[in-house]
Design a protein with these regions (language model features):
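Tubulin/FtsZ superfamily GTPase core signature
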Residues: 1-345
Length: 345
């Protein structure tokens, strides 16, 4: 005869759920996206309008008129006493001093965050000058600090290009990882667009790149990427590039997606064999298999440094039909390789 188990005290499901909700909330990764200057604020606006979830969005600028046009959870007019809300005059040193004047306001939005994305267009005054200040504050607060920046179109002039390279060199010293997108390389994807439309494409790619990383952490998937996974490749990850790919060729989607991503103009002329880490994020419709996603990660591992750390995840999106999409973030890329690729464009 089996001994009857002692009856357990009854606990209502609602009480259990409340406790679980409290635990889940305490474990929730806190993420902030801070847009610096006009370009960074535009990216924040696009993310806000797209309804990106689980992210605090903050826009910072020295131009009051532009800041008024931005949708965000929070806004900071930097350097009030210095610029009077009239902008930085395209001078990075003014952008830097404005951010330093507003450090107390900026601190409120980096303190307590697990991850801070510092977003800016390099080459102008406010973004170039303030982004390193924001990144330094985020690092001081203990956050994983990821810079996401663009390098200017050549049509924007030699001075802006020179400022961009100097600003990028300064920023990379303050961030754990700095992801770089070259506007002229992005233009190769849509070569016939007028300049204003090309800037919108840049905003969209920036937004999708950040969203790809945040979704991987905050939304459940077939294979999840957790915060510690991200720390593995992005804490002290150095310079990074992003490639995006997609394919609807069933049976070859993984191969074609990765080829698309790793041969993307977004990577420029950089030798990806030097990459020391990679994050591979795969999404698809209900026909997506874990085997396909694993294949994508394997293909990336074959193209980068054999000692590189690879993390990958995959998720099903109900609005995707017969298609597979991939985002590859390559970390540990040499700074000079990116600068040379930019100068040689």
């Amino acid at each position: 005869m089996f001994q009857k188990e002692a009856e357990q005290p009854t606990v209502s499901s609602s009480a259990e759920d409340d406790e679980l909700r409290a635990l889940v909330e305490s474990l929730r990764i806190k993420i902030a996206v801070i847009g610096c200057g006009g370009g960074g604020s535009n990216t924040v606006r696009r993310m806000y309008q797209a309804g990106v979830e689980g992210v605090k969005m903050v826009a910072c600028n020295t131009d009051a008129r532009h800041l008024l046009s931005i949708q965000a959870h929070h806004k900071i007019l930097m350097g009030r006493s210095m610029t009077k809300g009239l902008g930085s005059g395209s001078l990075p040193e003014v952008g830097q001093k404005a951010a330093e004047e507003s450090e107390n306001d900026l601190w409120k939005y980096v303190d307590g965050q697990n991850i801070v994305f510092v977003v800016a267009g390099m080459g102008g005054g406010t973004g170039t000058g303030s982004a390193p200040v924001v990144a330094e504050l985020a690092k001081r607060a203990g956050a994983l600090t990821i810079g996401v920046v663009t390098l200017p179109f050549k049509a924007e002039g030699a001075v802006r290009m020179s400022n961009a390279i100097k600003g990028l060199e300064h920023l990379k010293e303050k961030c754990d990882t700095t992801i770089v997108l070259q506007n002229d390389r992005l233009l190769e994807l849509v070569p016939k667009l007028p300049l204003e439309a090309a800037f919108r494409v840049t905003d969209e790619v920036l937004m999708q790149s950040i969203k790809g990383i945040t979704d991987a952490l905050t939304k459940p998937g077939l294979i999840n990427i957790d915060f510690n996974d991200l720390l593995t490749i992005m804490r002290n990850g150095g310079m990074a590039l992003i490639g995006l790919g997609e394919s609807s060729e069933y049976g070859q989607r993984a191969e074609m997606c990765i080829e698309d991503a790793l041969s993307s103009p977004m990577l420029g002329d950089v030798d990806i064999k030097q990459a020391k880490g990679a994050l591979v994020r795969v999404i698809g419709g209900e026909d997506l298999t874990v085997t396909e996603a694993e294949k994508a990660a394997l293909l990336v591992s074959e193209r980068v440094d054999p000692r590189a750390r690879i993390i990958w995840g995959c998720a099903v999106h109900g609005d995707i039909k017969n298609e597979m999409r991939v985002m590859v973030v390559l970390t540990g890329v040499k700074f000079n390789s990116i600068v040379d690729s930019f100068k040689n464009k």
